[in-house]
From Swiss-Prot:
Transmembrane segments: none
Protein's recorded name: Noggin
Subcellular location: Secreted
Known role: Essential for cartilage morphogenesis and joint formation. Inhibitor of bone morphogenetic proteins (BMP) signaling which is required for growth and patterning of the neural tube and somite. Inhibits chondrocyte differentiation through its interaction with GDF5 and, probably, GDF6.
Example of a GO cellular component annotation carried by this entry: extracellular space
Protein's organism: Rattus norvegicus
Subunit structure: Homodimer. Interacts with GDF5; inhibits chondrocyte differentiation.
Amino acid sequence: GGGGGPAGGAEDLAELDQLLRQRPSGAMPSEIKGLEFSEGLAQGKKQRLSKKLRRKLQMWLWSQTFCPVLYAWNDLGSRFWARYVKVGSCFSKRSCSVPEGMVCKPSKSVHLTVLRWRCQRRGGQRCGWIPIQYPIISECKCSC
């Protein structure tokens, strides 16, 4: 599919590079592990794919439908402590389904407590740190 303008080019390449370095990790989803890939083979024949080919097809399918969380540092600015937080995002530049149509979307998040410097002018200026709950994407899933 077509490219965005030159503005996001370097960011897109960095994101894609990070995605390509990531391989599906953990346990293979049971929906993929259970696939026999026997559809379309001649009926009535005891034809089965070799274990090696079946595994390759499963790994390919898993790599196409895998939705990793991509992490990047985000600067919240001088009014926050911690100023820099590592935030997650879901790679959504390509479809994660076969056939195409679904994309990776956030499915779980955790909350990080950061402090924000706030000043109130009522009755003289009073300043102090207030705790803020900052959401961080922790899991992405392939969905509509």
